[in-house]
């Protein structure tokens, strides 16, 4: 079930491979850059396998239920498969089914994937991922957004899809010369990329997690250059501001007179987010020394979040196959990106967001939002309640919201877990805002 404040669109069929589209729907457009495929060296992959072979697991008794974190036995199985069964070259070939580019933007090397739109008038759409995701977490929605007709949709809804890697999160490699990188500074890079580098006069934007904050900042600072934005959370842009921004509970008390269900939900969400925010904001560099040296340790840290944040019903394989997990982990490993990816959290607080103007709402670009009940606040149970809680609450005042939806299926990264819902919601946000 789902709830929204606008009319539903079409569910999407399974993805086609790149190259299977109807060429008659192509809208030619000269692109100003030459593609550059992803290629990880044999030496880097050999070093990865050697390190996996030398993995020394910790003593981990009494943890089969994940109550102490990732169980050693579960991780051992994935590490063995990473060493003996997983084939990065297969994943690399799938990734290279799309165009890839690396271009300097204000001196920062930026990698992005491009999928040309196929329709009468595609509009450019930049999609931004979060942590611990990579650009490849958008892979389930790229083709339907670029070529709606191939999936039973309206070709008038086509986008030219641009999917960058957040600097310091993956390709082209570790981020240097930008130690103060954070979400609002990336928004400036993205605007320069889309307008000055790629030559788009106007564009659309979407994002989840950190990517939602990047996208909201675009909608705040560069609203006149946007058709609109679509995001997977309604966090205010000052979410990481303040002396205790690492406290996910925001000082909410636990009292004996709270309803049991409310109390349980508060505790559940604190457990889901507390260690992530606290470590990344306070001493991420300390942890990074271990994660940068041990692929098994890196996988464990990522895996804890993929398991806790996905709507998997106790079965992680229902959301991510082993190959899915290891493709994303391999991107982090071969690029040496874990330390700089975690730096975004501390820097969002150390270099706090400040408004670029005093107009209200803060995010003036037309905004669509997609929520999932898996992340409902305490006391909110249904999709209708989730939509109502947002539209009547303080976060809504930040946004020029034009399309708010909630769905029963999906977790923290909705475009991966429920791509059909994300596609439908995003199309609805922009359907009447195209030229």
Protein language model features and the residues they cover:
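Short, Lys/Arg-enriched N-terminal segments with co-localized hydrophobic residues
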Residues: 14-24
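Non-catalytic accessory segments flanking enzyme active sites
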Residues: 45-117, 333-336, 340-355
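Glycine-rich "HGGG/HGxG" loop immediately N-terminal to the catalytic nucleophile
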Residues: 88-90, 153, 162, 166-181, ...
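Conserved HGGG/HGGXW glycine-rich cap/lid loop of the alpha/beta-hydrolase fold
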Residues: 120-172, 430
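Conserved hydrolase catalytic core segment
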Residues: 144, 148-150, 197-249
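Conserved acidic catalytic loop of the alpha/beta-hydrolase fold
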Residues: 184-203
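C-terminal subdomain of alpha/beta-hydrolase-fold enzymes, centered on the catalytic histidine
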Residues: 280-435
């Amino acid at each position: 079930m789902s709830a929204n404040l606008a009319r539903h669109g079409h569910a999407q069929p399974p993805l086609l491979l790149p190259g299977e589209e109807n060429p008659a729907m192509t809208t030619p457009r000269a692109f100003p850059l030459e593609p550059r495929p992803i290629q990880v060296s044999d030496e880097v992959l050999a070093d990865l396998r050697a390190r996996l072979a030398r993995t020394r697991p910790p003593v981990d008794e009494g943890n089969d239920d994940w109550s102490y974190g990732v169980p050693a036995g579960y991780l051992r199985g994935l590490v063995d498969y990473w060493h003996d069964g997983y084939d990065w070259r297969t994943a690399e070939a799938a990734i290279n089914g799309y165009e890839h580019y690396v271009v300097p933007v204000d001196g920062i090397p930026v990698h992005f994937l491009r999928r040309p739109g196929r329709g009468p008038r595609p509009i450019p759409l930049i999609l931004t991922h979060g942590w611990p995701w990579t650009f490849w977490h958008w892979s389930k929605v790229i083709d339907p957004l670029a070529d709606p007709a191939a999936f039973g949709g309206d070709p008038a809804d086509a986008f030219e899809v641009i999917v960058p890697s957040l600097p310091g999160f993956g390709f082209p490699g570790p981020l240097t010369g930008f130690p103060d990188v954070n979400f609002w500074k990336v928004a400036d890079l993205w605007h320069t990329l889309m307008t000055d580098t790629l030559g788009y006069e106007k564009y659309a934007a979407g994002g989840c997690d950190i990517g939602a904050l990047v996208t909201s900042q675009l909608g705040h600072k560069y609203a006149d250059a946007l058709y609109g934005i679509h995001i997977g959370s309604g966090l205010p842009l000052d979410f990481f501001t303040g002396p205790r921004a690492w406290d996910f509970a925001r000082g909410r008390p636990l009292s004996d007179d709270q309803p049991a269900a409310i109390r349980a939900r508060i505790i559940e969400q604190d457990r889901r987010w507390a260690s992530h925010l606290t470590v990344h904001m306070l001493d991420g560099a300390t942890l990074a020394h271990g994660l940068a040296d041990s692929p098994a340790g890196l996988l464990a840290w990522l895996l804890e979040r993929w398991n806790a944040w996905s709507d998997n019903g106790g079965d992680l394989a229902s959301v991510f196959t082993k190959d899915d997990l290891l493709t994303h982990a391999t991107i982090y490993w071969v690029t040496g990106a874990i330390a700089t990816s975690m730096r975004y959290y501390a820097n969002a607080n150390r270099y706090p967001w400040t408004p670029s103007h005093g107009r209200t709402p803060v995010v003036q670009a037309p905004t669509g939002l997609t929520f999932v009940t898996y992340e409902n606040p305490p006391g909110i149970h249904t999709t209708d309640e989730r939509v109502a809680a947002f539209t009547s609450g303080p976060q809504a005042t930040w946004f020029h919201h034009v399309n708010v939806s909630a769905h029963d299926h999906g977790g923290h990264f909705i475009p991966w877990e429920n791509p059909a819902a994300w596609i439908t919601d995003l199309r609805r946000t922009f359907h009447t805002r195209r030229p």
